[in-house]
């Protein structure tokens, strides 16, 4: 069939291998492109935003966005719950939120979140990983994968 999508030509992988302190309410900057993005996925290196484009003949394009990484309270922070979430158009998705409660600062936890995001034909949607905590969070070895699934 002509409309059958094939593997890696419909996915992209963005990462930040450094440990980054992300302020409350801010997005994680993605500094490396491990797998080059197709035309329906756009990203500027160093930006925290990834743009999904509704380039499709159907009513909408569907993407699976997943994030994995390690999070901790940075030195000088207050011990308590910290959280990160996938954000669509700047709004955090409660269904794609990871919350951990470290016992001490610099105590890293591995987190993973994923969501399906639908983009209407001809439209664009931005996605990011957002610090939804009330304080700065250290994020290390982060990896955001975007797959065009339909």
Q: How does the language model describe each region?
A:
Residues 2-150:
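Extracellular jelly-roll beta-sandwich "head" domains, especially the C-terminal globular C1q domain
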């Amino acid at each position: 069939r002509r409309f059958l999508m094939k593997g890696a030509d419909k996915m992209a992988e963005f990462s930040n291998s450094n440990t980054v302190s992300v302020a409350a309410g801010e997005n994680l900057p993605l500094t490396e492109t491990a797998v080059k993005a197709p035309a329906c996925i756009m990203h500027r290196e160093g930006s925290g935003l990834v743009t999904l484009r509704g380039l499709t003949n159907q009513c909408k394009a569907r993407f699976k966005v997943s994030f994995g990484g390690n999070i901790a309270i940075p030195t000088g922070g207050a011990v308590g719950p910290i959280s990160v979430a996938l954000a669509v158009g700047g709004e955090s998705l409660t269904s794609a939120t990871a919350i951990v409660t470290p016992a001490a600062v610099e105590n890293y936890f591995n987190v993973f979140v994923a969501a399906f995001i639908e983009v209407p034909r001809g439209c664009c949607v931005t996605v990011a990983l957002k610090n939804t905590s009330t304080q700065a969070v250290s994020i290390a070895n982060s990896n955001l994968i975007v797959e065009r699934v339909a």
